[in-house]
Swiss-Prot record:
Bilayer topology: Peripheral membrane protein
Originating gene: atpH
Protein name per the record: ATP synthase subunit delta
Source organism: Priestia megaterium (strain ATCC 12872 / QMB1551)
SUPFAM superfamilies xrefs: N-terminal domain of the delta subunit of the F1F0-ATP synthase
Gene3D superfamilies linked: N-terminal domain of the delta subunit of the F1F0-ATP synthase
Length: 181
C-alpha cells in the first residue's frame, strides 16, 4: 500500500477517535507539535530510521521527545515507529488537518501576490472565495511572487484562480499570436 494511503488510514483512525472524545482541536494541536518537532530536528528522523539503533532505544527517544503530549498521540507515533512507517508522520498530520478542516467548513488556500497581504486583505479574499468552494472560511497562506507583476493568484485544493497581471498579459499575447496565423 502506498505511503499516502497508509497516512490517510492512520489520520482517519485518529480523527474518528478524536471525534468520539470531542478532542478534534486538541488532537490537531498536538499533531502539529509532532510535525514541528520532526521539521525542526531532521536528525530525529535519521535516528528513528537508523537500522543499527534498537527499537527499544528508538521508543525511548519518542517517549522523551513527546512526553508532554497525550497518550493517544504518543501511542500513534510509537505505532508508526514499530511498523516502520515513521516517515509518514508529516503526511498523516496533513491528512488529519484536512479531515478536521472539512468538518469545520474550512479549506487551506495559498495566495500568491507581489507583496505580503495584510490581515484585512486575507480576510477579504477568504470571504470572497470561501463560498465559491463551498466552505465557511479559508486558511490563507501568502507567498510573495514578484513575477505576477500585480494582482493575485489563488490556489484552493486543485483549483487555481488566476487574477494576476502576468496571466492576463500571457492571455493577450496568445490571442495576438492566434490572430496572426
Amino acid at each position: 500500500m502506498s505511503q499516502p494511503a497508509v497516512a490517510k488510514r492512520y489520520a482517519l483512525a485518529l480523527f474518528q477517535l478524536a471525534t468520539e472524545k470531542q478532542m478534534i482541536d486538541e488532537m490537531q494541536d498536538q499533531l502539529q507539535i509532532v510535525e514541528e518537532v520532526f521539521a525542526k530536528t531532521p536528525e530525529l528522523m535519521d535516528v528513528l530510521t537508523h537500522p543499527k539503533i534498537t527499537i527499544e532505544r528508538k521508543k525511548q527517544f519518542v517517549s522523551e521527545a513527546f512526553a508532554e503530549l497525550s497518550p493517544t498521540v504518543q501511542h500513534t507515533v510509537l505505532l508508526l515507529l514499530e511498523r516502520h512507517r515513521i516517515q509518514i508522520v508529516s503526511e498523516m498530520v496533513k491528512e488529519y488537518r484536512f479531515l478536521a478542516n472539512e468538518v469545520r467548513g474550512v479549506a487551506d488556500a495559498t495566495v500568491y501576490s507581489v507583496k505580503p497581504l495584510s490581515a484585512d486583505e486575507k480576510r477579504a479574499i477568504s470571504q470572497s472565495f470561501a463560498s465559491k468552494v463551498g466552505k465557511h472560511t479559508l486558511n490563507i497562506s501568502n507567498i510573495v511572487d514578484k513575477s505576477l507583476i500585480g494582482g493575485v493568484k489563488l490556489r484552493i485544493g486543485n483549483r487555481i484562480y488566476d487574477g494576476s497581471i502576468s496571466s492576463k498579459l500571457e492571455t493577450i499575447h496568445r490571442g495576438l499570436l492566434a490572430h496572426r496565423s
